[in-house]
Amino acid sequence: MAEYTLPDLDWDYEALEPHISGQINEIHHTKHHATYVKGVNDALAKLEEARANEDHAAIFLNEKNLAFHLGGHVNHSLWWKNLSPDGGDKPTGELAAAIDDAFGSFDKFRAQFSAAANGLQGSGWAVLGYDTLGSRLLTFQLYDQQANVPLGIIPLLQVDMWEHAFYLQYKNVKADYVKAFWNVVNWADVQKRYTAATSKTQGLIFG
């Protein structure tokens, strides 16, 4: 069975300073993300064993663990691509037009996305996603690593609101972290994801 692996980053840990510190990025990548990778591989191994033993209680437990850790791995893999030392500013082209159509303007989108991030209770993510059935952009709060995700959604942009993503630098002032996040958003990556979502996933659930 193929194992999940920790992806390399496209930039050095210090590259996002002063907006996100090198210390945070290094710990976030080598400790937190690595733990999710180990967790998903462990869950898969235990799930295989439980199935062989027809232990349904263990199957259900490890399916839950798999969902959590795989969610953490996927979310963080997207997170690193969503960030760039050359990021910031605003999107252009088709993505900019889609944001204007869905939210009224980029400033209104930014305010709504930031409110989703700052208003999150507990741990999770704020997400901009593409609804493959309604052919529209949506923002929503993702709880923990896998909960409250609308079906048929392709994530395009996410901000990590777990405390490990910001506390060493911003303490409990989440709003300052979210404000800093906009300075390193890799809009080229978000545009690439939007193009793929709109061209390859029509009616995702129904085929």
Curated annotation (Swiss-Prot):
Its cofactor is Mn(2+). It comes from the Bacteria. PANTHER family: SUPEROXIDE DISMUTASE 2, SUPEROXIDE DISMUTASE [MN], MITOCHONDRIAL. Belongs to the iron/manganese superoxide dismutase family. InterPro entries: Fe/Mn_Superoxide_Dismutase, Mn/Fe_SOD, Mn/Fe_SOD_BS, Mn/Fe_SOD_C, Mn/Fe_SOD_N, Mn/Fe_SOD_N_sf, SOD_C_sf. The gene is sodA. Destroys superoxide anion radicals which are normally produced within the cells and which are toxic to biological systems. This is Superoxide dismutase [Mn]. Binds 1 Mn(2+) ion per subunit. Keywords: Manganese, Metal-binding, Oxidoreductase. Its EC number is 1.15.1.1. Signal peptide: none annotated. GO terms for molecular function: metal ion binding; superoxide dismutase activity. Mn(2+) binds at H28, H76, D160, H164. It catalyses: 2 superoxide + 2 H(+) = H2O2 + O2. The keyword Secreted does not apply.
